[in-house]
Regions:
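N-terminal domain-onset segments
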Residues: 1-208, 212-243
């Protein structure tokens, strides 16, 4: 739990950390900036507690803290905004957990409660999660616990295994064969059910690759969470730089 001191500091800078761009446009518009975009639906994901986390699933899946913000427990569609190009490949710009059909009117940065709030923040600065293996995920903490139990059993059988080479690699390739749209041969997304549980883990390629990425909670006019967004690429800014 965050300290009272941390919470007081957070309240003082909270409004500075909101996203000024309309993230929902990734899922309603056909063009952002000068780039055509498309939406990929990767299926429903179960959030049994509504406490959620985001991380690189190949590096920090067992250790990541959940966000202070929560969503109502339930099962929701997960969608990916894709920027398809010949030159740069099919890049995943934004991932959305669609909690309701309502339109967001503000976007609050997801926080876990241990961020360093003493540093000066610029207008475009944000806190987020690190990616070191080119993939991201967003899931419920119950899914995290289920994975820990499953992986502990696997490690008992073979202590030298790792999550990519001995689990996700083959599953990603199989999913790419079954659903090739906007995927390479090695696979770029997977909606994986944790064995013997009702939990599932959506994983997806992280934009341009490794980096540091924010998660935003979208709130509707009633102040209720209507969606959660993982932002990998600022399309308008990023593709201008590539030109």
């Amino acid at each position: 739990m965050p300290t009272t001191e941390w919470l007081n500091k957070y309240e003082a800078i909270k409004n500075k950390l909101t996203c000024k761009d309309d993230l929902e446009a990734h899922f309603t518009e056909k063009v952002i900036g000068n780039m055509a975009v498309d939406v990929l639906d990767i299926g429903a994901v179960h959030f049994p507690t509504g406490q959620i986390f985001a991380c690189d699933p190949l590096v920090e899946l067992e250790d990541t803290l959940p966000f202070l913000q929560t969503i109502p427990a339930g099962t929701y569609p997960v969608k990916i905004c894709v920027v398809p190009t010949e030159q740069y490949g099919d890049r995943y710009a934004c991932v959305k957990v669609e909690v309701s059909q309502e339109k967001p009117v503000r976007y609050e940065l997801g926080m876990v409660g241990n961020e360093n709030l003493d540093a000066a923040l610029g207008d475009d600065d944000y806190f987020g999660f690190g990616v070191d293996a080119g993939m991201g995920c967003i899931a419920d903490i119950q899914t995290q616990a289920a994975f820990k139990t499953y992986w502990a059993k696997r490690l008992e059988e073979d202590p030298d295994i790792d999550p990519y080479n001995d689990l996700f690699c083959d599953l990603l390739e199989e999913n790419a064969k079954a659903h090739p749209k906007y995927q390479g041969d090695c696979g770029d997304w997977l909606n994986w059910p944790v064995p013997d549980t009702d939990c599932n883990l959506p994983i997806f390629a992280s934009g341009w690759g490794d980096g540091y990425y924010p998660v935003y909670f979208g709130y509707d006019a009633k102040g209720e969470v209507c969606a959660v967004y993982v932002r990998f690429i600022d399309i308008e800014a990023s593709y201008k730089e590539q030109e």
